[in-house]
Each structure stands twice: as structure tokens, then as C-alpha cells.
């Protein structure tokens, strides 16, 4: 059988049958999140540790806290009654607002509402995601209801990106206990 006996439409169909699966595999690979290295996990985990120290101490007038975020980073409230009712309320965006959110910046660390508290970040889960990584971590506070009190105070849901300065928080949402997205993980609202 000569090649000239095949109709051009049959050749085109055969080529499409070969090309379509290859295109699908390529597209699927592009949509999946890249793997994170062990160093990525350590550096992202350090953000949670540095966050707790920066917020507890208002170090560097709140700018140590702000510098854990990207330049356009956001902190969203989904823990207060107002934030919960609005399904999230951006409380701070960008370095200056984030420094003030930590009690610093123009506020000068004078009346930090959580003075005497210790923020503990526990059970940090960091799955890779397109463009960076997601994070989910419980927040437990010591001292929020008086000396030696211990309370789960919801948690944080984050999106991290790798910048020239290393991993940074692009967005952090403080979520109250009953608002965690998996109903099996929801606990009575203590906030």
C-alpha cells in the first residue's frame, strides 16, 4: 500500500490522535504545583516561628512582622464577629499597615492589645500550590485570658510565595475555630 493512497483527512486524524494525549499531559503538568524542597519547607516553617516572635514583641517597631509579608501582603480577619460576618475583612495591606497591625509603625508599640501573650503556631501543614505554597496552622495563645491561660484561638490560612528575599507570606487569614473549611475539623467556637 502506497502512502499516496491515504486520504489527507485520515493522516490528519491520525496525527490528532497522537498529539491530543501529548497536549493533555503537557497541560496537566503545567497546572500541577511544583514540588517543594526540604529547604523550602524549613524556610516556610521559619515564617511561622518568626511571626510569633515578631507579633509577641513588636520588634523593630512592628517592621519585623511586616517584613514577613510580601510588599503587597495582606492580613485578613475571619475571627472577629465583624470579620466573620463579612466572610473575611482585610485589616492590613502592605508594609506600613502591617507594621501598625502588629502594634508598631505610627502606633509605636505603646498599646499592643496582646501584650503579655505568647502566640504558638502548631501543626503547620504546607502543601505546594501553583505559584507558591499554601499553609494552615493552629494558633494557640498563652496569657490571652490572664496569666497561664491557654486557648486555641482559631488558626491561620496562608499563601506563601518565594521572593528575592526568600519565602514570604502573600496572604494570611486568621480564621476562627468553627470556620475551618473541613467540617470534620470544626470545633465549638470559643472566640
Regions found by a protein language model. Name each.
Residues 2-15:
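Bacterial N-terminal signal peptides that target proteins for export
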Residues 30-35, 109-191:
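A beta-strand edge to alpha-helix "cap/lid" segment located at domain peripheries
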Residues 27-67, 71:
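Short, low-complexity N-terminal intrinsically disordered segments enriched in polar/charged residues
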Residues 61-62, 66-138:
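A solvent-exposed, acidic/Ser-Thr-rich amphipathic alpha-helical stretch
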Residues 55, 69-70, 77, 139-141, ...:
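Short beta-strand segments enriched in hydrophobic/aromatic residues
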Residues 13-23:
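Bacterial N-terminal signal peptides
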Amino acid at each position: 500500500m502506497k502512502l499516496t493512497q491515504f486520504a489527507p483527512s485520515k493522516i490528519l486524524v491520525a496525527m490528532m490522535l497522537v498529539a491530543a494525549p501529548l497536549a493533555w499531559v503537557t497541560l496537566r503538568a503545567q497546572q500541577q504545583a511544583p514540588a517543594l524542597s526540604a529547604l523550602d519547607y524549613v524556610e516556610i516553617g521559619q515564617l511561622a516561628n518568626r511571626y510569633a516572635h515578631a507579633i509577641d514583641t513588636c520588634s523593630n517597631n512592628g517592621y519585623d512582622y511586616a517584613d514577613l509579608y510580601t510588599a503587597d501582603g495582606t492580613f485578613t480577619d475571619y475571627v472577629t464577629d465583624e470579620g466573620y460576618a463579612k466572610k473575611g475583612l482585610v485589616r492590613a495591606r502592605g508594609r506600613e499597615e502591617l507594621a501598625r497591625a502588629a502594634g508598631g509603625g505610627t502606633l509605636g508599640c505603646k498599646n499592643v492589645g496582646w501584650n503579655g501573650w505568647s502566640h504558638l503556631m502548631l501543626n503547620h501543614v504546607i502543601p505546594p500550590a501553583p505559584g507558591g505554597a499554601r499553609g494552615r496552622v493552629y494558633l494557640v495563645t498563652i496569657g490571652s485570658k490572664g496569666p497561664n491561660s491557654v486557648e486555641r484561638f482559631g488558626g491561620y490560612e496562608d499563601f506563601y510565595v518565594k521572593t528575592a528575599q526568600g519565602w514570604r507570606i502573600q496572604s494570611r487569614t486568621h480564621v476562627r475555630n468553627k470556620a475551618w473549611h473541613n467540617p470534620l475539623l470544626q470545633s465549638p467556637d470559643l472566640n
